[in-house]
Amino acid sequence: MTTLPAGALLEGDVRPDADAIVVLLHGASVGESGSTSWCAPAPWRMRWFARAIRVRSRRRIAVLRLRNPDRGWPVVFPRALSDAKEALDHIAGIAPNARVALVGHSNGGRVALSLCSDTRVAAVAALAPWIEDGDRFAGRRGQPVLLMHGALDRRTDPRDTLELAALLRRQGCVVDSETVAGDIHSMLARPRYWHRRVADFVVSQFSSAA
């Protein structure tokens, strides 16, 4: 476990010879009971994606989970974005040649998408991403992006994700976009499907490591 400069925690080991790393970014946990704990709902959801990726890759892809402290709603996105950048800096300092994928849910999806332009980020998966008016996401040509959104999500709008998919395609990203029938923001109606889909996407990007 690594404590990053601003207090976020990064779970998982980074080896200097690591070839492929995925960082999981949870949604906002402001106001949730025990929101600074790994057992709070938002960080806990990402645990199952971590397990699915480890199993699917036969543990050849290093899986890290980032946990953001609860700093209050007004700063939840900018601080989470800063935490993710610190995680990328930490990884680059140990394994500068590693390819990195970001997988984020809700606010974590917004963070992951905001880092598409960072050349250290090889691929992005954004799950039910929180998208605000005025967000300007800039993908890179040829960059793989997975976008998934529950059709019944009432917290974030699946139509925004469809519009984003079209924008990223125009920017040259290789976008795989899906609206998941019957599911909601928590991704708990069809959890195994989400886990499998994300694991398959990540492993396909790092096929030489898997």
Residue ranges, per PLM feature:
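A conserved short beta-strand
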Residues: 120-131
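Short alpha-helix in the alpha/beta-hydrolase fold that links the catalytic acid
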Residues: 157-167
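Alpha/beta-hydrolase active-site loop
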Residues: 74-94
